[in-house]
Amino acid sequence: MDIVSAIVPLIEMTIAGAIINASVHFIPVGGAPAAMATSTGVGTGTTQLAAGAGFTGLMGAAVMASNVGLSPIGMALIMISGAVSSMIMLGVTMLIGQLIYVFGVGVVPAADKCEIDPITKDPQKPYVTPGTTGHGVPTVCFVSGLIGAALGGIGGALAYIALRKLGLDPGVAGMLAVGFFFINAVLASYNIGGTIEGFHDPKFKKMPNGVIASTVASLLFGIISVLMVL
């Protein structure tokens, strides 16, 4: 493979990294406090939740790629498959968590970072238990999580497409794509610095810095990947 043929996959990987980093900022993560229903979001770490959705999307994209190839239409189908797979995984995760919060713990889903849910227009503050920063997965957080999952699936699928275009075997491309996703998810996690409720959270404004960091890291990852196949 010559340098010219490697430029397009390099650009695709750089864009994919930026998309993945942005996607993580949409996902409602409450960390350890959420596991005790004292913080809004799903009770796990930012990287783990984002990576789980991304890996599911990556598997969906890989299965689709094996059937449709890497034509322009095929690439679109691969990215759609990645997005839908990620959305299903994260949607089910948030739903099961919600059922446990509501019927197990007995708390009302309420967001701490907004007075009124931007989607349902329901008031939030009256339902936040004193001493907590919200609990459960309110509608705005659920929708934000689905958006983040879709973006993460698209980013992971695009990275897989780029690696396949470099001539790597599906298995090798899949392993590298997993590592690639973790790199960008961790960068986003450091940028967030703890928990985040979704696109309505003030921490969401930090996203541009994370995207810039992931763009640089993804470009470096892409250059190394290209050098591997030259």
Curated annotation (Swiss-Prot):
Q: Name one GO biological process term.
A: methylation
What is the name of the gene encoding this protein? Answer: mtrD
Q: Which residues form a coiled coil?
A: none
Q: How does it sit in the membrane?
A: Multi-pass membrane protein
- Annotated membrane-spanning segments are 7-27, 60-80, 88-108, 142-162, 168-188, 210-230
Keyword terms: Cell membrane, Membrane, Methanogenesis, Methyltransferase, One-carbon metabolism, Transferase, Translocase, Transmembrane, Transmembrane helix
Its function, per the record, reads:
Part of a complex that catalyzes the formation of methyl-coenzyme M and tetrahydromethanopterin from coenzyme M and methyl-tetrahydromethanopterin. This is an energy-conserving, sodium-ion translocating step.
**Catalytic class of the enzyme:** translocase
Q: Which reaction does it catalyse?
A: 5-methyl-5,6,7,8-tetrahydromethanopterin + coenzyme M + 2 Na(+)(in) = 5,6,7,8-tetrahydromethanopterin + methyl-coenzyme M + 2 Na(+)(out)
Q: Where in the cell is it found?
A: Cell membrane
E.C. numbers: 7.2.1.4
Q: Can you tell which superkingdom this protein's organism belongs to?
A: Archaea
Please list the GO terms describing molecular function.
tetrahydromethanopterin S-methyltransferase activity
Record note on quaternary structure:
The complex is composed of 8 subunits; MtrA, MtrB, MtrC, MtrD, MtrE, MtrF, MtrG and MtrH.
Report the protein name in the record: Tetrahydromethanopterin S-methyltransferase subunit D
**Can you quote a single GO CC term?**
vesicle membrane
- Per the similarity annotation, which family is this? Belongs to the MtrD family.
Q: Which pathway is it part of? A: One-carbon metabolism; methanogenesis from CO(2); methyl-coenzyme M from 5,10-methylene-5,6,7,8-tetrahydromethanopterin: step 2/2
